[in-house]
Amino acid sequence: VTKGTSGEWRFWYDLNKGTLLAAALFVVMFVIYVSNHPAGFTPNVVQTASNKAILLAFVAMAQCLVVITAGIDLSAGMVLVLCNCLASWLVVGTPMQTAFGIVAVLVAGLACGTLNGLIIIFGRLQPIVTTIATSGIFFGLALLLRPTPGGSVNEALADVFTSKLFGIFPTSLVVLAATILLVWVPFSRSVYGRAAYAAGSAENAAYMSGMPLKRAKLTAYALAGLLSAMGGLYLTFYSYTGEAAFASGNAYTLYSIAAVVLGGVSLAGGKGSAVGAVFGALAFRTIGDLLFVFDLDPLWQPLFQGIVLMLAIGVGSIGLARVRNRLEWFQ
């Protein structure tokens, strides 16, 4: 291996260290889970775990897009809840009506994210304040749609999206991979994606260099709304119903922040990947599955989630401290 190649690998590793750590953590935890599951490593076990984890994975991807710009979206969970309630009204009937309903749900999520972006960028308000306010609006709309749990969904379509491809591989993971390829990869490699990273790492310098920061941020928030809507749509497919659950919306928001941190995304912005956020979400969700197979009280789940999160943050802090120590050598 040449010196240049070694340097490239080191650079790639430093850039993707958080993603690799989250992936390794998830693999270890999932192996422990399936090894101790009464049914073992079977397609049905993987399917059930995937269908539950994909909800948080979508919201974590949404959160990642915003966090990269040095923002935060505290309305992500409520967008999921709103779109779940909307889907329970619209994703029914004939194939044409169902298709229209899916498009309407995704457009609604896109509109929610765009609203957040417009207020933050042109209203010049802090993301945390803006998204707290809009989360209340989105939850209010969800309550108007579903004051009590109810509704339905096209069950044939729901079964397709929550079943197994060729009887082996979970369809939900195929949809998740397709979303990464169709949403995250084009965005991260586009001018807007590079500007989003620049906004999170050195916004003043990026502004002076003429990068399209406003459009990049608006795109990030809009896509975040779209991804949260996909989570809401999948929740409807999984539960066959809609519910304006305040606690559930808040939980998805908080867990999405934990997932991006676990996935190596810097809350200061400018660093991280949606792939890492997805692995962070999968690892975070697997904690609950581990409690199930070891027959532990679910009340222990927040404690174990907190421990795993603190360990992940600790590893990241050690790496950051090492970088700072090296920089001090040149001062």
Q: Which functions belong to the PLM regions below?
A:
Residues T19, Y33-H37, S163-A198, P212-K214, ...:
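Alpha-helical transmembrane segments of multi-pass integral membrane proteins
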Residues S228, E243-L303:
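Transmembrane alpha-helical segments in multi-pass inner-membrane proteins
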Residues V1-V31, L181, M208, P212-R215, ...:
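Cytosolic-side transmembrane-helix boundaries in multi-pass membrane proteins
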Residues P95-G136, F279-G280:
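Alpha-helical transmembrane segments within multi-pass membrane transporters and channels
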Residues L25-F41, T69, A142-P147, W184-V191, ...:
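Structural signal for alpha-helical transmembrane segments and their membrane-water exit/capping regions
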Residues D14, P127-S190, A216-T219, Y238-G249, ...:
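Transmembrane helix-bundle core of multi-pass membrane transporters
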Residues N36-T48, L143-L144, T148, F187-G193, ...:
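Inter-helical junctions in multi-pass inner-membrane proteins, predominant
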Residues V28-V34, F41-T94, L118-R124, V260, ...:
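Single transmembrane alpha-helix segments in multi-pass membrane proteins
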